[in-house]
Regions:
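Short loop or secondary-structure boundary microenvironments that flank
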Residues: 14, 61, 75-77, 99
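Conserved active-site alpha-helix within GNAT-family acetyltransferase domains
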Residues: 15-27, 32, 116
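N-terminal beta-strand motif that seeds the catalytic metal site of vicinal oxygen chelate
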Residues: 1-21, 71
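Short amphipathic alpha-helices in soluble, non-transmembrane regions
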Residues: 22-26, 84-89
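Short aromatic/hydrophobic contact patches that present stacked aromatics
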Residues: 7-9, 46, 70-72, 106-108
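Short, conserved charged micro-motifs
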Residues: 16-19, 79-84
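Vicinal oxygen chelate
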Residues: 1-3, 86, 90-122
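Conserved short beta-strand elements that form part of the metal-binding/catalytic scaffold
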Residues: 31-66, 116-121
Length: 122
């Protein structure tokens, strides 16, 4: 049966790898991991998440941003979540808080191409 989630992939337009690296490593603080050689030619980037998971940025020639389908990134505690929201805001990224889920604090933002991202207390 299923033991966990290995990775989640979000799409990005062709030629956006450097912008992806700036956003996901520079703003969000993720660490890029090398793609296996046979996959590197496809472009994109792989990033390490806490807990052993990965975020894969896949290049899609027919890219359309995803709004409903989105990853939800766990952040350890409300103080760190608030600090991350401030960091995103300082980078010019709009943050929308949502308290509709009882027992959790969360907000939404978008990546540079308009894909929806959720950040929620762990």
């Amino acid at each position: 049966m299923i033991d966990g989630l290995h990775h989640v992939q979000v799409a990005a337009p062709p030629g956006s790898e450097e912008e992806a690296r700036r956003f996901f490593t520079g703003v969000l603080g993720l660490v890029e991991v090398p793609k296996p050689e046979p996959l590197a030619a496809r472009g994109g980037a792989w990033l390490e998440l806490g807990g052993g998971g990965e975020l894969h940025i896949g290049i899609d020639p027919e890219f359309v941003p995803a709004f409903r389908a989105h990853p939800a990134f766990a952040v350890d505690g409300a103080e760190r979540l608030t600090a991350l929201a401030a960091r995103l805001g300082g980078a010019g990224i709009e943050v929308t808080w949502d308290q509709a889920q009882p027992g959790a604090s969360r907000f939404y933002a978008t990546d540079p191409w308009g894909n929806r991202l959720e950040f929620i207390t762990a």
